Amino acid sequence: MAQQQQQQQQQQHLQHPHQNTNSNNQLQQQQQQLQLQLQLQLQEQQEQQQQQLQLQQYNNNFYSQNYNMEEYERRKRREREKIERQQGIQIDDRETALFSEPRRLTEGDAEITAALGEFGDARVYINQSTVGISRHAPGAGNPRLQAPPPPKTLGHSHSPSSSSAAGSGSGSALPGQSQSQQQQQKQHYQQQQQQQRPPGYLKQADNKPPYNGRGGYPGQPMKNDIPSSSGMAPPRGPPRSGSGSISNSNSNSSSATNNATGGAAGTTPLGPPLSTQMPNGREKSFLGPPAPALHNGAGLFVPPAASKRPGGGSGAGLQPPPPEKDITKMISEMTNSFRVTAPLTSIAATPHAPTRENYNLNGPNTNKYAFGPIGSPPIGSQPSSLMAPLFAPIAPIASPITSLLTTPPHASQGSLGGASPVAPLQQLPPTPPKAAAALSPTAAAKPLKTEKNHTLEKQDSCLENDLELSESEDEQRKKESRSAGNSSNSSESDSSESGSESSSKGDHQQQHHHHNHHHQQQQQQLQQQQQQQLLQQKQQHQQILQQQQRQLTANGSKKKYSHSIIAGGGSTISGLLTSSGFGSGGAGNGGCSTASSGGGGGGSGSGGGSGSSSGIGTMSSGSSSNKTPSPTESNKWTLSRFFPKPANQTSSESVSPGNVSMKVPGILPGGAQIIPESIEVTTAIVKNEKIHDDHMDMDEVEEEDEDEEQLQQQQQLRYGAGLSVTPVAVAVKKEALDGVGEMGGLPAIPKNQIKREAEALHSAARLSDSGTSGSGSTSSSSSSSDSAPGEVVPMPGPGETLQLPGVPAAITTVMRVHPTLMQKAPPNSVTLTPILPLPASPKQRQKKPRKKKPATSAPILDSSDDDDPPAAKHALELSAAAAAAAQAQATATVPPLAVKKGRGRPRKQQQSGGSGNLSSASAGSSSQTKGPTLTAAKKPLVKGPAMANSRKRDHSSQSSSNGNTPTKKLAMGTGTGTGTAMAVPMTVIPSGPANASAVAAASSSSDEDSSSSTGSTGSKSSSSSSSSDDTETTQNTKCRIVKLNKTGAVPPLARLGAVASAGAGAGAGASGSSSPSSSSSEPEDHLAMSTVSALPMAQQLMQPYKPRAVSQHSQQLSSSECSSSSGSSTSGDEDEAKREKERERKRKSDKNKISTLTRIFNPKEGGAKKQGQVVIMDQSEEQQQVKVGDSSSQPVPVQNAAIAKLRMTPTQQQQQLGAGLASPARTTTPHLTSLICKIDLSKLSRERIMRLKKLTPSQQNGHLTPKDLVTIQTQGPSQPVQGHLLPAKVKHEHPHPVKPEPELDAGYESKFKPGNVKQEFQLKQERDRERERERDRDRERERERERDREREREQPTGGRRRKRSSSSSSSPYKEKKRKKEKSDHLQISKDQLLPVPVLLPSNNHERISCHERLSFDKLQLLHEDAAAVAAAAAAVSAPNGSPSKKLLVMSPLPPPPTAVVVPPAVVAPSTCSEAVQTTPPSAAATATAATSTTGTSTAPPAPVTRLIYRSYFDREEEPHSDDHRKNNQFLVEAVNRKHAADSERDSFNQVTLYLEAVVYFLLTADSMERSSSEQATWTIYKDTLSLIKFISSKFRPYQQSTNGQHETHNKVAILSLRCQSLISLKLYKLRRTNCRTVINSLTEFFRTGRGDIVNGNTPSSISPSNSVGSQGSGSNTPPGKIVPQEIHTQLSKQNEYLTYVNSAHELWDQADRLVRTGNHIDFFRELDHENGPLTLHSTMPEVFRYVQAGLKTLRDAVSHPTQQTLHQSH
């Protein structure tokens, strides 16, 4: 011990004589001289060899770093072997150089290894100590023992490995020094063995004897025998987390060893250079930067030389340790040092560091190095002096130095010894006591060991280290203290280990900074009492660890914490590694704590192998992060880490799976963010939208976040979130900011590491919140809208989210405006709500604002919002944001409604809303569940909600929702139109009459969309004159939300509003707003509706609170709707040409909208409908139901509805009856999802609707009996007074809402409730039963309606309608014919939901006919009634209404319904259109909204059957998001799900999680395809294909199993095959250009016949003909053609490319066969109906939506088998 102390003193003196105390320096010098002499005598030969090797290594420090990184694995082997060898052959330089410290494969293994390793170290230590006592040779002989002195001798070799290398090398060169070094090394030896053993790998198995086997000679390549050749990351699992640190430390140590060995032996005099270079194997390159950045950067000891000399300082610090040579001290050291196993266990997560630290049995040795770098008094004094002042910073420095030296964990801690008491406390609480006991003389050594433990912990928490980088402040402090204490040591040690250890220490130091500081001070005092101090430190460190562990005690909390850390900056892979390695316990906790601040460093660390461990140091030094020649696998984020393929390829590219935790939010080196799957933030599958972003844009971010968090917690975040991955980041943002104090260090996080630091943080924070609660539900956490269907979340207060099982938080977020906000507008008054120019923030918000706003505002408006044209949507978003205040003002009137719509609804709604999308609407509403987010993103994207409507229609119409769609469309139209009118920010005509005239202009569009929804009509009528204005509004021109406050029927409406205050009342408010937007709705009807619905949405949300206001709104809406209706028919005639032109013009916008919406809401988008798109249509239906239910539950409202219906009596009764019947049919098959969404709306804005839903489906469907209809119509006239302006339109709107709403609402309502799904299934069953009856009725009604329509067309009033009819359907006859055909077809394809569409169209036709028959007054009354009764529905239907208008235009396409429906009112056509045409109809419908003209153009409904299909050209590619944050979040989500699946025990959950991960990878690849290089995209696609193939092979046995899950597994397998097929096709497409070139080249080659023909027996002309060999071989050569190598290569490539094409088709066919053989046609048919068919032309976002929707359905089936069975029976 005395010798060790002397060595330490000498080394310290050599390294930092100026820093060491004079006495210590003198003693060290003297001792070193003596020891060097002895060592020279004993090791002259070794020194010579070592000097040469060390010189080479010294020259190749950089090489050594890389080499060490490569050798890291080799070192592992060697360490294993060397443990034995060193124990037996410690003096052998090579053997000693090979640190055979055991590596931990897992945390458990780490514990075992730590115990064994420490035991081995203990033996080595005893041998060294005892031998050292008897002779200095053991120290000298033992490279590790010797190594420590050289670092001290070599001011630069701070790492134990370099020290040991230098020690052994210089042991012979400097016998005296090596003796003292040996003693110190004995202390360090174990530490070095621990620290250097990994570097011991450095000594290559490649028998290069000259250099202690530390690292190759400079020129020698570091051979990585171990596959994970990134020396940075030890292959073993636990070490990986620490591997960054360890590998850094190892590579540093190896390089340090090489430098120390070669340099120390050869250049012991070079000591400082060697230590500098050695520690640097990395530090050499980062000699200055690592130390400065980590410690010198802290500025405490800026001079790298100081850092070089800290070895000397450490030697000085170790002067007290020489007494430690005493047996008692040795024993105590052994006891304490080797006891470190316990801390190591807690630090198990940081295998390398813990192992090394464990092996660094002598903390003093580490302290020696630490002191050497610090250049302060002997370890004992130095820790106190340096560590006391700089304690936190010093500890980090020491650890970095240590890592840079030999085994960064040990060495860095050793070098940090004095400075790293904190680190030891953190990582090595157990060890320091042991070390202290053993090394009482070297108190610093003990702290160093503690530091080692800390280093271990830090390395264990490599992520934590990186995360610590995030906590740059703490780490900087640590750096500062390190710089002061370890300025020189920090150079190497800091670079490699300071990142991991210092940041890790920083974590602990942050927590234990004071403790560590005290420890440093104590160490000064405890130099004499080092054992006690070590024990205290150990205890304190353990306490700290315990505290940390307490914090991390719960995995959830740990995850949360680590999430926060990672979010803070731990987002980096290192951070992820740390997070993943929570096993480190206290260390992990500390690391996590520092992670936020150190995350930046970690992030940079993740960039390089060294960066992972030194990433923290990178934060401090910034050099370590990129310095990692071989980044730890944790730094490699390429998908390969997620796939079986090795992640060694590019150190910067791939992060080893062990290092990166998918469960921990973080940022991969490429900037990709890993967001824990459990994060619920991605509630809706919003393609590129973030619900949270929308909310944020809508200023509802907080609300949204809260809602989403609630949903996450309550629902555990279903995976259904769909594409809106970024919302996680957004949601996380809050939590990250709130929960991550570590974020203070974020500034240090490298931008390259965190592309989206804020988002990563947010996602991490949120992830931490939801990750803990929802980690279990990782797969489901992404979609809050996918919350358990049976789970009914009580509606929260205003601003909170109504958590509905199937609806995303954003949608359900009820922007509860207090009733005061929903003050009813005075009757006959126009409420103008100024809307900020939408263009201000149109596009960005287009996705987010709407989303957020819808989430905030009443969900009901989702569908209405969908209907708004994209421009309107955009305007809506802007208006939502700009008119947020306006909404507050007009909330009572209109704005709330708009909000909801803005969400995800628009897409689907536009898809289904426009074309009688009841079924589509239900699909849309389900899609809206996730759609709100999508819509929010897509709405802006798709400026034509018509697109969304058409898309919806594509979904539902393709799903044969023609019949369903019409009904739904009607309902939607009513509610939507109303909602839209309210929300539409437009220069709306102030009064009803003006609206009527305006409606005339917008009447076509109004008809399209308003026929389906009275609200829509009303809004159109009010905005018909402002239709162009609306368009402008859509264009974000100055907009005012014009609310027609017609309260002529206020009392009745009030009743209705009271009845349907939640649904109808809100609908009424929506209607009021809808009427203004209705005119502009035509193309922009969706937009207007969108805008309107945004405002009314708030109202709807408010309405439940203020039913009275709602009823007023209902009245207003109803009047608006009525006027819209009337205006549609009346002014529609006048403005037909104009409207048609507008529509045609709008068609383009609609097409754009449709295209966008199609992309957004494409059924393939994976449940846009399911995931939170709320189809207002449902509310309309619900409103109808409300009418029925109100009559039953609330007599007065029902009477009001009856009055309105009386107006509608001739046709409406039939229509209503048909609607009731039709709606059931519609909602039957694919609308479960939609129903959920719709229910969401109803729940948000209508309470009575729920009551109505309580009614049996049959009651709801047929609730309005003819008598009831008559009664309602009778009552209706009183209300029509209010809506007298648009009677015709009112008719259409009213029927639609009445028709679809009852059943859809019932179904949706049911879905919202736990039993709702069952109810929905029952409803579907009843609907199926009723379908036959309804079909019969519908047929008759359709005939009657056709007749009526013909009459109306003939009539002057019906002239325009005729135009519509003619436009919709070429002629009444054609319409009738089409209706009949469609009815028959629907009936035939009853199972396919076609029957439902038929019923709906029939109802629509009947209604339309009735409406046409009815006078405008009647229509107005009916419309008002519909608006009043379905006030809430109006809000919902308003959005749908816009689509309805579009759909109406397209309705001609649907044979029976369209032909009949379109002419009378856009309602029927829209229904049909929706059902038939998904996207194109919306555009066409919008164009047709003009009325006849568009209708006529669309009129050729010849493709009656085609109506169910959408044109291939209707689907436009979704606008790609350039938001890298979202792209990163996709990757994070994918990684999280992949990791969650890895740890999942249930086979079904595992396979679904894997498949979810795959589709998220596909989203990532899709986004990369637009932003990254083709090669990167190719790689991720190829890796994803490998992953999915692996998954498929893994779960193949389950497909044949006879257990109940084999069918579900088969369905998942089919989805998997589809994905594989599309990925294969994508791989071909990515190489299509290359393939074309290759084919052309090969074609030319074969055409020209180039190439020499070789006869079978003709000897080669190359060799002599006499050549026996040539003859012999030639004689056996078959005849053939010599193909040039180039051609052969091209043939190989061609084969590869064409194999992808072949595989794509083979896999697709295989999936089709499985569908048929497994009798899964119904399942996939329903999926196609709801989400659009999945084809080989589908885009990745569509694949994502489709697969997500399918997996959600399967999950629901598994979790609710009874409901599923019920559904099947239905």
UniProtKB/Swiss-Prot annotation:
Residues covered by region (Disordered): 1-28, 134-327, 402-660, 761-805, 822-1173, 1291-1390, 1483-1502, 1656-1683
Role according to the record: Has a role in transcriptional regulation. Acts in parallel with the Ras/MAPK and the PI3K/PKB pathways in the control of cell identity and cellular growth. Essential for regulation of the cytoskeleton and cell growth but not for cell proliferation or growth rate. Required specifically for the microtubule-based basal transport of lipid droplets. Plays a partially redundant function downstream of Raf in cell fate specification in the developing eye. Pair-rule protein that regulates embryonic cellularization, gastrulation and segmentation.
InterPro entries for the chain: AF4/FMR2, AF4/FMR2_CHD, HMGI/Y_DNA-bd_CS
Assigned GO CC terms: nucleus; super elongation complex
Compositional bias annotation for Low complexity: 1-19, 154-204, 227-269, 434-447, 483-503, 521-552, 615-625, 768-800, 880-893, 909-928, 994-1028, 1071-1081, 1111-1131, 1483-1499, 1656-1676
Basic residues composition bias: residue spans: 511-520, 844-854
Protein name: AF4/FMR2 family member lilli
Biased composition (Polar residues): 402-414, 626-638, 647-659
Subcellular localization, as worded in the UniProt entry: Nucleus
Annotated GO biological process: periodic partitioning by pair rule gene; regulation of cytoskeleton organization; regulation of DNA-templated transcription; regulation of lipid transport
DNA-binding region: 900-912
Entry GO MF terms: DNA binding; transcription coregulator activity
Main location: nucleus
Bias (Acidic residues) ranges: 463-474
